[in-house]
Amino acid sequence: VTGGLQAFVVNVSTAIRPQIVQSYAIGNYTRTINLMYSLSKASICFLYIVAYPIMLEIDYVLKLWLGANVPDFAADFILIVICITFLNNLNSAVSAVVHASGIMRNYQIVGSLINLVSIPVAYYALSLGHHPTSVFWISFVFTLFMQMASLFILKGIIKFSFLSYAKRVLFPFALLILASFSLPLIPFFLLPCGFMRFLIVSAIAVLGSSAVFYFISLNHSEKLIVNSFVAKILRIKK
């Protein structure tokens, strides 16, 4: 499930990452940071658009996919992993700038250490008899640490403001969630579980969140990027 969602987001980021490398290479650091903001926002917002209906209907999706043989805690595992994927998508834009700079030592060392430390912590949690989902929550926390550490490392490479990052990336994402999450809940709670409810919930969630994303979360330059991306897809299909 998460692999399919991530594949969709990768197609979006592919259009922006080369521009980040090019901007950094010619010394246009302002454009580099602006592209990083845009890629971070686009990555998590596009993931939300396709992931939210799946998160709502995860029990039905698993039943449709696996039949009666749904493993214990599978739904919980997937929901937590999707949350981890949101953080990873935030980090992918930061990673693009770090790789464009070529100054990767600290980034790689810190990332490796954080991933390494999470393993014994998860093992210790299980040895104490904690719920199996605790392993994934621990992974979520360490992924969050990695995202925070990545931003501090990036600040040592290129000048940017944490406040600007919050305003350009996190605030529009929070606005998208607040403005779009409630409408799909109406058919979700009113209709019986089944394929028809899944279609209606998915349609409302995707269309509603897409509209909010385009008209509220994006600035003018980002709308031009999205328009260009959509036009390119339409030309390919023709």
What residue ranges belong to the model's regions?
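Transmembrane helix-bundle signature of multi-pass secondary active exporters and lipid flippases
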Residues: V1-T14, F46-V50, V81-N88, F142, ...
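Helix-loop junctions and terminal segments of transmembrane helices
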Residues: T2-S40, S95-A100
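Residue-level recognition of pore/gate-forming positions within transmembrane alpha-helices
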Residues: G3, S38, A51, Y60, ...
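Alpha-helical transmembrane segments of multi-pass membrane transport and lipid-handling proteins
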Residues: V9, I33-N89, L116-Y124, I177-L178, ...
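Internal alpha-helical transmembrane segments of multi-pass membrane proteins, especially GPCRs
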Residues: Y37-C45, L79-I82, I109, W137, ...
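Membrane-interface junctions at transmembrane-helix termini in multi-pass inner-membrane proteins
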Residues: I82-I114, G129, I158
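Membrane-interface helix-loop junctions in multi-pass transport and translocation proteins
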Residues: R105, S112-M148, K155-G156, F160, ...
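Membrane-proximal transmembrane or re-entrant/amphipathic helices at the cytosolic face
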Residues: G156, F160-A166, P184-K238
